[in-house]
Amino acid sequence: MEFLKKLEVWFVVGSQDLYGDEALKQVNANAEQITRYLNDQNPFIQIKLKPLATTPEDILSLCQAANYEENCVGVIAWMHTFSPAKMWIGGLTRLNKPLLQFHTQLNKNIPWNEIDMDYMNLHQTAHGDREFGFMVSRFRKPRTIVVGHWQSESVKQKLDRWMRVLAAIYDQQHLKVARFGDNMREVAVTEGDKVEAQIKFGYSVNGYGLYQLVNSINTVNDEDITALVKEYEASYQLADSLKDGGEKRQSLIDSARIELGLKAFLDKGGFKAFTDTFQNLAGIKQLPGLPVQRLMAQGYGFGAEGDWKTAALVRAIKVMSYGLPNGCSFMEDYTYNLDDNNEIVLGAHMLEVCPSIANNKPILDIKPLGIGGKEDPARLIFTSKSGKATASTIVDLGNRFRMITADMQAVDKPQDMPNLPVGHAFWKLEPNFDIGTQAWILSGGAHHNVFSLDIDADMLRTFAEYFDIEFIHINVKTELPNLKNELRWNEAAYK
């Protein structure tokens, strides 16, 4: 995630020449104070104050410059005074970077004894932002609105969350997804229009022959394998059979070789997300389990069975959640525990669940896999952390993409499962199992999802709004009749 260090958000403060030089100097000084403070809070992305926007020409120039500056990932607009919105028409019609309308003011409280008309003329966000907001709404332009004093914790958190979404948007627009093999045969939801995805999101999806990956695996040197195996030993609880001298030690070495070769291929090609499928493994000794788990933990996106849409979404949520403590993973609804009024979903996959969500030190073991026709693969075994969580997916409906996010509560495992050989999570659906499941299915939600313990639906809605794709949020207030109506309305709204 080194690319995050070079990103910046531009802070554009609106006013007008009507107020005179002295007032505008004070506006600029106040903007500098706010910028310094916010940057001192160690934001996810640095904020860069730009010259005051006081004329249509200034505003047009700023917006065009933001478009052309590669490292600028978004614009914060604040109307310190009244800034007539017709001045913003030229700039806003051209601005193609994410926009945040910052509805704040310098002083938290009214200076009751000192307030006069000079103060009133200078501190006009309350109506200046309404004028600006009208014009943005007139353009039907998506934006985020943050309301509150710039020193409040809630405002800082909202800005941080917005910046995290910006980083994911930027990354999607530069993302390359590598596919090894095609989709799992006869599966529908993992298919999709890769050309339309590149037009809509910006990422490219291309396929590569297994022989190319095999060549990369075969060129890995023994010294690097030895070093990686030592890293395994330091990071995980190794089963006895995988320890030095164990009967399955060679399989662990083979897995390390696959990991190094896979990573080398991805890095050489600039790929930050990838897919594979158990039906296309020619030349590879085992289905990559441990290698995929570890690469996801390093921030790569992944989708099993050729699921490139989920691979790209895993990467997006990895970027959004960089530095946060709880993790996210490729996931699949696998099976249920159907106690009355206490239904629980067991989420997992054949192998590929990211250890960033693990609640303890994972066990590294090799177990049989009765699918794929290859040698038994290495994998990390663990249970997920508990807490508020989301499951998200993007599906291709033929004429548009739809993102679906479901609120959930990840829970501790009810009982030990000594024979379950995969990483896994348990969760309860909102508003309950019945409605939550129906809502996902009615919305066309995939059987693959991105499970996150850090990123919530509001952030994902902002992500979807920027890309102008449909967003369905399943939550504690979801009612099926209302959802069915929303799905009907969206058929018209997103044509």
From Swiss-Prot:
GO CC annotation terms, alphabetical: cytosol
GO biological process: L-arabinose catabolic process to xylulose 5-phosphate
Ligand binding (Mn(2+)): 305, 332, 349, 448
Pathway: Carbohydrate degradation; L-arabinose degradation via L-ribulose; D-xylulose 5-phosphate from L-arabinose (bacterial route): step 1/3
Pfam families, per the entry: AraA_central, AraA_N, Arabinose_Iso_C
Known function: Catalyzes the conversion of L-arabinose to L-ribulose.
Family membership noted in the UniProt record: Belongs to the arabinose isomerase family.
Substrates-to-products reaction catalysed: beta-L-arabinopyranose = L-ribulose
UniProt keywords, alphabetically: Arabinose catabolism, Carbohydrate metabolism, Isomerase, Manganese, Metal-binding
CDD domains recorded: L-arabinose_isomerase
EC identifiers of the protein: 5.3.1.4
Superkingdom as given in the UniProt entry: Bacteria
Annotated InterPro entries: Ara_Isoase_C, AraA_central, AraA_N, AraA_N_sf, Fuc/Ara_isomerase_C, Fucose_isomerase_N/cen_sf, Lara_isomerase
Enzyme class: isomerase
Note accompanying the cofactor annotation: Binds 1 Mn(2+) ion per subunit.
Cofactor(s) it depends on: Mn(2+)
NCBIfam families in UniProt: PRK02929.1
Listed name of the protein: L-arabinose isomerase
A single MF term (Gene Ontology): manganese ion binding
